[in-house]
């Protein structure tokens, strides 16, 4: 787990109430995916301005905004015991993928959702007469996050879109009713929202972003790292091009895009038969699915990824132990201390250090033209930091680092 991921998860967990007392143990053992999803939901609620209650061992959350209290229970689809993971199988054909989306996944979603439905959380004293919501994410096999959202939506509403371009060149979307999903001898009815007792569930929240990759991106965005790294995100997103039949492929360098919200990629499916309905604007920064005049419609605003992978191109550099007078500095801390730091046009900041009393800052830079290492030492004045020492053209990172630390100590001691 790299710095942005680890530091962002630690930051979120620092205010996370462990209501059942099992979070850390399960996070470190068999419940890593489920607990990561739960931590992601907490980060989303907290950073989106909801009041959060975790005074009860179940459900996982009660949130409140604008006077409305909503109870939320999280669940995940986990690997089947003894099942071979998809990354050990051959690539799926188009027909095999369609079968998985149309039948296998809906049955897995149904199993998890009905398991939670049968617990009847809405009958708990603190959940009575308020909306109850289930949040779900699929971790059952390698690659499941890439194709699970459409399967869930089809299963919940019991219909799927058939898209084609007509002779006039316009996109035509036709609704096809789904009656059942079948794998082997197991058959379940489609249309979860239309099954008995499901009126007690006001909505289903789905995300394919409740993973460590989300924490990596948010940590990188907040500058929670002490060595330079390039983080790239690529995947498929909603395509706003008129008549688009397929999602749009994207590649983002996160150094150039830093406005991701915790809700980006979140999907909210509202139950048309809910006993206690939720308005379409209650869950912020999320795509909304709901029924109007018998038709399922979607509100998607802004960048909406369906699936993605996050790649760290340059990883952390190995470092030895620092003297007690010096510590590493987050990039975000540096930006707060120094509003404008002039640097050579072909140099990249790689590491940042600061004295414990915050009077001395040290920077290590890589000259991209000749691949040599340089350092800059800055000292705090009356109103700002000023460069007091610069050395250039080191061949090894370890050498420039040792020289910088020695120079910083000479100003400290």
Feature map (PLM): residue ranges:
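Conserved catalytic cores of phosphodiester-cleaving nucleases, focusing on short active-site segments
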Residues: 61-63, 70-78
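Beta-sheet entry/capping signal
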Residues: 51, 60, 69-70, 131-133
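Acidic, metal-dependent phosphodiester-chemistry machinery of nucleic-acid enzymes
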Residues: 1-15, 20-28, 75-413
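Short strand-coil-strand connectors
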Residues: 64-66, 357
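A short acidic/basic microdomain associated with nuclease active sites
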Residues: 42-64
